[in-house]
């Protein structure tokens, strides 16, 4: 179904609230957003360059300065890169919504007989799909430089799924910023300024126990640390995971899932409320 097909629906369906039609509408918007990468493939290319550069930079430039006894730094690094990629990739959700608002696309969508939830759901889903592609690409790059999954195929799939779920949850935070600020350049600047400290004050690139004491307290509850450590609990072998992360493997996984659930519970309603006010 296309956007034109949505416009051809009877007016009586304007305020339908059934789950089926709402899902269908969201998928239409998802398709519309993904087609942008087909028509302008350079957008997808440039969205993958930065993560690849970070992998190579930290693995070969900074990696020599990071010494974790008994642990291959690349095995420690890649889960952090997954989360960093997911977070920075999710910034596109807010930027895309701000762009749609500034170009009048949101007003056009409002005039169509479609579920109001479709615009937000379609945007976050399409960006999550793009982030999945980038995470898979990062996995391939990681294998080329020596990264390995040590927990088996199922744990590897679970780790990738955890990264994708985190990117989806973070997309709703970005959506709220885009809907609140509504200007593309301002949204981009605000997103980077607010996310950057969380990424680098986390365990994404170095273990928490190597940080100063005052920073450890923040890093331990940082959602990015929780997500990165949750993935490491699945990708490292059990002995190494216990040494690097401490505690039980599944505790870290559940903490990551809890952080995702908390973000969704808080920011999905706030984003929907902000969308209604646009």
Where are these regions (language model features)?
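Hydrophobic alpha-helical transmembrane segments of multi-pass membrane transport proteins
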Residues: 53-58, 74-145, 170, 174, ...
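Short helix-capping/hinge motifs at transmembrane helix termini and TM-loop junctions
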Residues: 58-67, 145-150, 154, 181-183, ...
């Amino acid at each position: 179904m296309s956007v034109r097909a949505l416009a051809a629906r009877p007016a009586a369906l304007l305020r339908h609230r059934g789950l089926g039609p709402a899902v269908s509408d969201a998928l239409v918007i998802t398709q519309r957003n993904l087609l942008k990468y087909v028509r302008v493939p350079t957008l997808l290319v440039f969205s993958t360059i930065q993560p690849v550069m970070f992998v190579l930079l930290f693995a070969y430039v900074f990696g020599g300065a990071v010494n974790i006894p008994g642990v291959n730094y690349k095995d420690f690094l890649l889960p952090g890169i997954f989360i960093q990629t997911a977070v920075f990739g999710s910034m596109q959700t807010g930027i895309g919504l701000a762009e749609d608002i500034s170009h009048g696309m949101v007003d056009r969508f409002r005039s169509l007989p479609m579920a109001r939830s479709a615009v937000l759901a379609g945007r976050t889903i399409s960006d999550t799909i793009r982030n999945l592609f980038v995470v898979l690409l990062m996995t391939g790059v990681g294998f080329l430089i020596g990264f390995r999954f040590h927990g088996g195929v199922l744990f590897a799939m679970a780790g990738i799924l955890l990264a994708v779920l985190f990117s989806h949850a973070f997309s709703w935070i970005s959506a709220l910023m885009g809907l609140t600020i509504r200007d593309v350049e301002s949204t981009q600047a605000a997103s980077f300024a607010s996310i950057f400290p969380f990424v680098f004050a986390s365990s994404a690139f170095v273990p928490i126990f190597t940080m100063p004491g005052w920073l450890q307290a923040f890093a331990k509850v940082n959602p990015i640390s929780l997500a990165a450590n949750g993935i490491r609990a699945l990708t490292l072998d059990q002995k190494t995971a216990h040494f690097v992360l401490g505690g039980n493997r599944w505790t870290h996984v559940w903490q990551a899932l809890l952080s995702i659930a908390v973000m969704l519970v808080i920011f999905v309603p706030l984003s929907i409320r902000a969308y209604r006010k646009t």
